[in-house]
Amino acid sequence: MTPTGWDQTEEPALDSPTLGVLAIVIAVLVACVLLAGCGAGDGHALGDEPITPAAIAAIAQEHVDLEPRRIAASTVLAPELGDRSTAAWLEYGDVSLTVVVAPSSNSPLVCADPTFFDECVTDSVDGHEVTIAWQQLEPEEDPGVVYVIDRRKGEDALVKVSGPSITDGPRDLALGVPLADLAALVVDPRLSLTTSLPVVEQGADVDIEQGGPHETPAPR
């Protein structure tokens, strides 16, 4: 006996073409999630092109609202971060930046040993979760140094800030480049060991010295 009010009408089965369309839609949505958004088309998506010092410099110039006096490839941090690290050095008058991406390591420069720096803290800067490390001024010896670091799966991206006298925590100092801009730079997904072809091509337009600057090994 059929219970009162029970609607025995069966739901129509989905035909094969409909199932095919649904499968395509699901596949596209999954691809969009993996690529961090559809319709990017602006060269920001990660790729498999090895990043170059010139490409790193091009990315840095998008975040730093200053005109560099000099740009050079840099290997000054390679002894600490490894031969697979890639870096660019940009000089802006009283401040210079060394921007590096390297395979993950236990280097003290990425705060693997937090006692290496005077301070090594994880902080949110303008919505970007980064690690900030610094060594303070030693009068008549060393002006100090600041590092802003993004530790990711498989790699570390960081920027070393040289030039200003570090007399306090970086949040309380004028570094020459806003801390928020430095944080946005190191978390930029294009700043990776491998990046997209458009980013590499963008770097081809950068006037960069290949010999490297005369830097002193850091941080001391």
Regions from the PLM with identified roles:
Residues 2-8:
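Short, charged N-terminal extramembrane segments
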Residues 9-28:
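N-terminal export and membrane-targeting signals
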Residues 28-31, 97-115, 178, 204, ...:
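Secretory-pathway extracellular proteins and peptide precursors enriched for disulfide-bonded cysteines
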Residues 35-37:
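C-terminal motif of bacterial Sec signal peptides marking the signal peptidase cleavage site
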Residues 39-41:
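Bacterial signal peptide processing site
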Residues 47-70, 179-192:
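Short, non-transmembrane alpha-helical segments in secretory-pathway proteins
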Residues 70-144:
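Short, solvent-exposed recognition patches
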Residues 141-144, 151-220:
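Extracellularly exposed regions in secreted/surface proteins, prominently low-complexity, repeat-rich
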